[in-house]
Amino acid sequence: LGLNIKVIDGEKEAYFGGVAASNLLHDDTFVTVDIGGGSTEFCFVKNGKIEKSISLNIGTVRIKELYFNKNNIDGAKKYILDNLEKIFKLDVEIPKKVVGIGGSIRALSKLIMAKNQYPLDILHGYTYEVKNEIFLLNRISKAKNCEDLKSFGIKKDRFDTIKEGSFIFKTILEELKTQTVVTSGVGVREGVYLTDLLRNSNHKFPHNFNVSVKSLLDRFQIDEKQSAYFGNNAKKIFDSLKPFHKLDNKYKELLVVASKLNSIGSVLNFYKSNDNAFDFILNGLNYDFLHTSRVIVAYTIKFSKKSLPSQEDILKHKDLLPSLEVVQWMSFMISLNIAINQDFSRPKVEYVLENKTLKINLPNKSFLIESNIDKIETPQ
């Protein structure tokens, strides 16, 4: 076939995992942990830059054959701790956040999501606190037989090494004093690709570039100039109304994203376009987005051009959303943005705040725009 096959060592494997996580997750300071059959890879990332990579001879199959099959749990723990000593000799600050890569850690995250009845069926970016879930990891590692594993909801294809994987992960989390785990749906494969793609930019996307937003715009935006206008106007509206809504600037970024992507639903199907966009956004903003952020963007689009959402409207995802007041302000601002450019003329608008009233100065009087603005429900 003419394939050029390269064999990489464990340190390089760890590096590739770090490249994938640093580009495709929202976090910028963490250590990746990739538990395999024969080894576990660690990559330390600080402020978005990879500092150190290391591979240790700790793997599920190795631990199973050397210790678990002989019921030597104490020996397994000592073996893992002895190997982890190499990490403390790296002269690197150990983060409180672990990014989990690989099948064992993803399988454990799925169990935790199911146990907690998590409202999104999305693994990449799923985050949990170690103190809340360490007990479950401990119970899985002590399972007596397949029936015990089955009772946890573990799938049959994971029976062989899930106990060992859970034991290794639990021991690592405790020894590194980890507080938070972020689940990664990407790993070595994506890291190899990104390392080649970004070879001239230190293996990092530009600071203001989001691969998910770019992908959705490339596939579904109706007009590039319209998308850019909606994004720029969103910033102006947010800043003009800041004395009223008093929202953190992180919501401005999300309002810009929602405004740029608001036409996706119409491209998919004109009827119920907002509902179509809602489902699509939840699953489409895969990379470099917190779960909370993608839910906010989805709800902002869903309630554009509509009456303000009620508490009942956001009930399903309330644990991932800010207060109802914040959601209503986001809904209002995107609705105002869309109304101002209802005829796609991209008017040059001036916003003036006087006596607690927002004045919108348009270059030309438009009955269509004015009537649509009048229909928008305002937050209290």
Model feature map: region roles:
Residues 1-23, 27-29, 44-46, 52-342, ...:
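Helical "lid/coupling" subdomains associated with nucleotide-phosphate turnover
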